[in-house]
């Protein structure tokens, strides 16, 4: 019984150490989008944007609104590309 408890404790410790080693640093964490808006959102509501990370199942742009909401959008849509260009110019 003591051997099995020791083995279990050892395995749990290994699992925790392994999961911590595979995590990305907090500064590199990105949010993934699983759905995106289909309608254009008003540009006046948008403060900035970021792209989803490489590990996400689908590519998306995440717009941050002035009220603090995050809205996912399809980067292939023309209005999304125009918003990105505008926001990039404003940040220069």
From Swiss-Prot:
Residues 1-21 form the signal peptide. GO terms for molecular function: CCR chemokine receptor binding; chemokine activity; heparin binding. Plasma serum. Transmembrane segments: none annotated. GO terms for biological process: antimicrobial humoral immune response mediated by antimicrobial peptide; chemokine-mediated signaling pathway; eosinophil chemotaxis; inflammatory response; positive regulation of cell migration. Its main location: secreted. Coiled coil: none annotated. Keywords: Chemotaxis, Cytokine, Disulfide bond, Heparin-binding, Inflammatory response, Secreted, Signal. Disulfide bonds join 32-56, 33-72. It comes from the Eukaryota. Belongs to the intercrine beta (chemokine CC) family. This is Regakine-1. It comes from Bos taurus.
């Amino acid at each position: 019984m003591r051997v099995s408890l020791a083995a279990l404790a050892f395995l749990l410790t290994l699992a925790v150490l392994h999961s911590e080693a595979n995590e990305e640093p907090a500064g590199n964490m990105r949010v993934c989008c699983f759905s995106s808006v289909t309608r254009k959102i008003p540009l006046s509501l948008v403060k900035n944007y970021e792209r989803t990370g490489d590990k996400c199942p689908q590519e998306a742009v995440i717009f941050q609104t002035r009220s603090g909401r995050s809205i996912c959008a399809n980067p292939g849509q023309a209005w999304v590309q125009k918003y990105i260009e505008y926001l990039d110019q404003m940040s220069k």
